[in-house]
C-alpha cells in the first residue's frame, strides 16, 4: 500500500482513489485496416496513478465479411454475372465497387471466367500511400428457361457456327 490508512473513505471510490466508469468513445477507424488489426487511442484509458497521465485504449478490429466482395489484404475480388450476349458481342458493364459503381469493358469473345484487373480500385493501404486493386471475374449466366421462340433462334444461330468459331474444341 501507500502506508496510509484512509479514516473516512468517500462513498464513490471507497478510498481507492479511482472510480470505475463505463464510457463510450468515438474513434476514427484508419482506412484499410484489416481483421485482427488494432489501433491506439492515446490518453483515453484508465486514469493514471497519483495524478499521472491516463493510459491508452487499444482497439481490436473485426471486419465483417461483405456479401458482394472478397478481400485479400488490400485487393478486392468480385464475381459478376454477365449474359451470353454480353460475353459474345462485348459490352460495358457496371460493377459495384467499394467507392460506388465502376464501368468495365468486356471485349467481344471474352471467355467465361475471365478476370479483369482495375488498378487502384481496392482497399486503401493503412499508411495512406496508394490502394490495392479490384479484380472482376465475369461468369456467363446461362438462362434456365427459354421460350420456344428463343430456343428456335438459338438453334438457328448455332447452325451458322463452324468449328473455326471455337478455339478450345479444336483437337477433340
Identify what each model region corresponds to.
Residues 1:
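Short, intrinsically disordered, charge-biased short linear motifs at domain edges
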Residues 4, 8-12, 18-172:
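Charged, often glycine-enriched C-terminal and inter-domain segments
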Amino acid at each position: 500500500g501507500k502506508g496510509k490508512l484512509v479514516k473516512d473513505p468517500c462513498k464513490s471510490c471507497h478510498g481507492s482513489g479511482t472510480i470505475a466508469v463505463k464510457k463510450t468513445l468515438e474513434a476514427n477507424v484508419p482506412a484499410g485496416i484489416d481483421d485482427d488489426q488494432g489501433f491506439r487511442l492515446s490518453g483515453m484509458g484508465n486514469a493514471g496513478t497519483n495524478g499521472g497521465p491516463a493510459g491508452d485504449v487499444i482497439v481490436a478490429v473485426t471486419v465483417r465479411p461483405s456479401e458482394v466482395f472478397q478481400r485479400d489484404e488490400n485487393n478486392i475480388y468480385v464475381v459478376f454475372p454477365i449474359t451470353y450476349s454480353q460475353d459474345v458481342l462485348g459490352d460495358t458493364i457496371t460493377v459495384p465497387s467499394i467507392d460506388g459503381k465502376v464501368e468495365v469493358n468486356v471485349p467481344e469473345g471474352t471467355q467465361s471466367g475471365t478476370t479483369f484487373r482495375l488498378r487502384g480500385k481496392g482497399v486503401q493501404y493503412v499508411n495512406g500511400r496508394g490502394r490495392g486493386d479490384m479484380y472482376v471475374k465475369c461468369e456467363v449466366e446461362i438462362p434456365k428457361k427459354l421460350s420456344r421462340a428463343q430456343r428456335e433462334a438459338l438453334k438457328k444461330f448455332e447452325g451458322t457456327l463452324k468449328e473455326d468459331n471455337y478455339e478450345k474444341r479444336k483437337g477433340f
